[in-house]
A protein has these predicted regions:
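Short linear sequence signals and composition-biased patches located at protein termini or domain-edge surfaces
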Residues: 198-287
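Extracytoplasmic beta-strand-rich oligomerization domains located immediately C-terminal to a leader/signal peptide
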Residues: 45-214
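Acidic/polar N-terminal loop/beta-strand segments that form early-domain functional surfaces
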Residues: 29, 87, 267
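Exposed loop/turn and edge beta-strand positions of beta-sandwich/beta-sheet ligand-binding modules
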Residues: 8, 17, 78
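N-terminal leader/signal peptides at the extreme start of proteins
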Residues: 1-12
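Short helix-loop boundary/capping segments at the starts of domains
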Residues: 40, 44, 53, 64, ...
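Aliphatic-rich helix starts adjacent to a transmembrane/signal segment
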Residues: 12-67
Length: 287
């Protein structure tokens, strides 16, 4: 009877192991050399895209308020902030009594007005406590309240008289104003300030800029024109990582001087990547 010796099991020799480790090391080093720049580039592009998106969102949010603002209500203490009075809507009011149907409610500039008919379909509707503004020729008027009055009631008049009837605290409409237009301002926000706070090119340990862009609302109407940017405690934050801001406003752009021009610039920095956007728009200053 023959006995067969078990087959010898063969493994890695020390030389083979060393060669394998060396080859894997070379492959790993090669992958790092070629892949790391590609990965870093992808991460940088993603960061810049996010910065551009955040900057665009913040600028368009400001521009939406600028375009909807009460005419001539923009005030700029400096290039780091600006104030305005955004509206919720507006329309045309009745300027004379209906000569056929009795019971209309015109706004008579000769006496104080407490109610008037509205020809336009207001969407959305203002609420009791919101503010009616008429003929804002000067920036200080809407803030001081000379052409602004609180809404006390809303009603639907006869169809021949208009779409809506607004009751307001007694207000004498400006003499000589023939536009027949009004705007209304939500009492929930009143005047609004946009401000850059803490913007600086000095970055923190993560490569982020320290500034923030904020929207401050519902602080009331200040008759005195601001000379500096306000404190931003409790304000809504629109953007972080702000490196710099620059807000410029020309109230009398063009030959007719009926429209202004606003330029909004913001620069954001995060993870040592920077995106800078500029947006400009014409501003209607015709009440």
């Amino acid at each position: 009877m023959k006995h067969h010796a078990p087959a010898r099991r063969r493994g890695f020799t020390l030389v083979e192991l060393i060669v394998t480790l060396v080859l894997f090391g070379l492959m790993g080093a090669t992958l790092v050399v070629f892949l790391r720049p590609a990965v870093d580039s992808w991460l940088a592009v993603r960061t810049r895209a996010a910065l551009a998106s955040d900057a665009d969102h913040a600028l368009r949010r400001m521009l939406r308020d600028v375009r909807a603002a009460v005419p001539n209500s923009i005030r700029t203490p400096n290039t780091q902030c600006f104030e305005l009075v955004p509206t919720g809507g507006g329309g045309r009011y009745r300027m004379a009594a209906d000569g056929v149907t009795a019971g209309s409610a015109p706004a008579d500039p000769q006496v104080a007005t407490t109610q008037f008919d509205v020809f336009s379909n207001l969407q959305p509707l203002p609420a009791v406590g919101d503010w009616v503004v008429v003929d804002n020729q000067n920036p200080g008027d809407v803030y001081s309240g000379t052409n602004r009055s609180a809404i006390t009631a809303l009603a639907t008049p006869a169809a021949a008289h208009g779409r809506h009837r607004l009751s307001i605290d007694a207000l004498q409409f400006p003499l000589g104003y023939e536009g027949g237009r009004f705007t209304w301002v939500p009492d929930s926000q009143k005047a609004v300030f946009y401000a850059c706070s803490g913007a600086s090119a000095t970055l923190d340990g993560n490569g982020d800029a320290p500034g923030v862009l904020v929207r401050l609302k519902d602080y009331g109407f200040n008759a005195t024109a601001p000379t500096s940017c306000p404190a931003v405690n409790g304000a809504d934050v629109l953007a972080t990582g702000v490196r710099s801001c620059r807000f410029l406003y020309n109230a009398n752009q063009g030959a007719t001087q009926q429209s202004g021009f606003v330029s909004l610039q913001i620069e954001l920095t995060r993870n040592n990547e920077t995106a800078s956007l500029v947006l400009g728009a014409h501003v209607s200053n015709v009440p």
